[in-house]
Amino acid sequence: MRVNVTLACTECGDRNYITTKNKRNNPERIEMKKYCPRLNKYTLHRETK
């Protein structure tokens, strides 16, 4: 079962990306290095509720 999740920047808190994940294969929160336009650099983005 795939669900939509929102990724938020850990440094500025902006919610920049929406992606999908499979809850059966990845039950924990996902983390990705993505581009943050506010900070103009690549930062760690975490899944938010």
Curated annotation (Swiss-Prot):
Signal peptide (UniProt feature, chain positions): none
Pfam families reported for this sequence: Ribosomal_L33 (PF00471)
Domain of life: Bacteria
Family: Belongs to the bacterial ribosomal protein bL33 family.
Keyword annotations from UniProtKB, A to Z: Ribonucleoprotein, Ribosomal protein
GO cellular component: cytoplasm; ribonucleoprotein complex; ribosome
UniProt-recorded name of the protein: Large ribosomal subunit protein bL33A
